[in-house]
Amino acid sequence: MKVNVHDPRGEELAQVLTRATAALAQVPSPRVDAELLAAHLLYDGSRSRLQHAALMGERLTPAQVAEYEALVARRAAREPLQHITGCAPFYRLELSVGPGVFVPRPETELLVEEALKVLSARAESATGQLRVVDLCAGSGAIAAAIKSELPNAQVFAVELSEEAIPYARKNLEPLGVHLVQGDALTALTELAGTIDAVLSNPPYIPPANVPADPEAALHDPDMALYGGGEDGMQMPTAIAARAYELLAPGGFFMMEHDDTQEEAVAELLGRVGFERCYPVRDLNGRPRHSAGYKPATSGS
């Protein structure tokens, strides 16, 4: 994106945005990204303020244009927008993210919505504090969303990655979530059999299904993407078994997975011992999550 500012008053913001949009032609949403980058740099992240400023003919100094150019160049190289701005929107929250941590996706909000339905109903009849666990927490997106909506719940998040933990800590500690750095398959042993809900967005992608988007393929950590084994089911299988151990009788489990894994996950949940299992589909009708309950009694 070449800039040639002749006017000593600077260059009109609207013109700069138009040029940036052209420079970002290869990204999925060039105009939106151009505006979000400018809003991040100049208007405390407020896209509406940016749009108003552009409409009113506001001008940028050469220094501002140069700094903005640098951000646009990074995005044009397919660095994730969220890495550049340092934040990602997720379920009414703005989460801290960056290199080394999985960027939360909109489809995971469906998991949060379904879990909140179940937990809200359970809270009405609960005699004590609800306990919720987020396994493979990454940035802490699921745990943060649950705690923000159910502030009286006791929420735990488990994440192994050294790179992800600083982001999770920044997102979760202000909310009062208990963050544990450790293996999702062995952590929280002292809570086994006492948890009301275990939620997880584990690594699940089969090794042959490398994400098409460079943002994911090149920047999301492999340990957050690939589930292990030819079908990607190694980690989901282990997470389902661990969830069953952590849950109290009647407890709820929900896990995100690839849309090709619906049958495999349904078989897995039944084999582990879950009952009343069901898929949750995204807005395009694809099965992206599966849920089930630990039997309320040992004889069920």
Roles of regions detected by a PLM:
Residues 1-55:
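Non-catalytic accessory regions of SAM-dependent methyltransferases
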Residues 12, 16, 63-64, 160, ...:
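Soluble or luminal CAZymes and related metallo-dependent hydrolases
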Residues 19, 36, 67-70, 110, ...:
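Alpha-helical elements of Rossmann-like donor-binding domains used by nucleotide-donor carbohydrate transfer enzymes
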Residues 39-118:
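Conserved AdoMet
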Residues 115-126, 244-245:
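Glycine-rich helix-loop-beta junction characteristic of Rossmann-like nucleotide cofactor-binding loops
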Residues 127-136:
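Conserved class I S-adenosyl-L-methionine
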Residues 139-151:
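Conserved SAM-binding loop of SAM-dependent methyltransferases across substrates and taxa
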Residues 149-296:
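S-adenosylmethionine
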